[in-house]
Regions:
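Glycine-rich phosphate-binding loop of ATP-dependent small-molecule kinases
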Residues: 1-213
Length: 213
């Protein structure tokens, strides 16, 4: 079972990907993790990717797909995998699709965790972090005992720049411009399934399990 997770930043797709991986005993393949592992291990592909990253450039799609295919060709992926963080654009999806087709393979499910923008802004701008010990909170869902103060170390909690409403809205714009077209791409391939990501995390997971069987 080969699955791609789609959804806006903050939709909770990473959490769902981990839960799917655990339930079905298949690896959670995150492109960020693969890049870090390849660079850490000094692989040829990793060193090539590092050249781009060190210059602050995006790693070309062909190279990303090469690194990805190298990962999914490993033994632990023979029964499937959950892809998280790739593809993000139509060109990436096309390169991946072509590479999988050449291997006689294909994606079984593309799961879109759908959450309206206003929910995402509320979700992300409610996050608070302790810069001292790394603990994270949410003003609504996981509030600290004392407002604005970390339960663990007593330091002040902050709203990270990444979670500020204007930053979140910018990230959502990029998502809609680049990643939203993937919904149409995978719909045409008859593999797209949409779940309501506004529900409780466990309910969303139950909906995904009902799709995957």
């Amino acid at each position: 079972m080969k699955i791609i997770m789609l959804g806006a930043p903050g939709a909770g797709k990473g959490t769902q990907a981990k839960m799917i991986a655990e339930k079905y005993g298949i690896p959670h393949v995150s492109t960020g993790d693969i890049f870090r592992a390849n660079i850490k291990n000094g692989t040829e592909l990793g060193m090539e990717a590092k050249k781009y990253m060190d210059q602050g450039q995006l790693v070309p799609d062909e190279l990303t797909v090469k690194i990805l295919l190298d990962r999914v060709a490993q033994d632990d992926c023979k029964n499937g995998y959950v892809l998280d963080g790739f593809p993000r654009t139509i060109p990436q999806a096309e390169v991946l699709d072509k590479a999988l087709t050449e291997l006689g393979d294909a994606i079984d499910f593309a799961i879109d965790v759908n959450v309206p923008d206003e929910n995402i802004v509320k979700r992300m701008s409610g996050r608070r972090a302790c810069l001292s010990c790394g603990a994270t909170y949410h003003v609504e869902h996981i509030p600290p005992k004392k407002e604005g103060i970390c339960d663990k170390c007593g330091q002040e909690l902050v709203l990270r720049d990444d979670d500020k409403p204007e930053t979140v809205l910018n990230r959502l714009k990029v998502y809609h411009d680049q990643t939203q077209p993937l919904i149409d791409f995978y719909t045409k391939k008859n593999v797209l399934k949409t779940v309501d990501g506004t529900k409780d995390m466990k309910e969303v997971f139950a909906d995904i399990v009902a799709i995957l069987g």
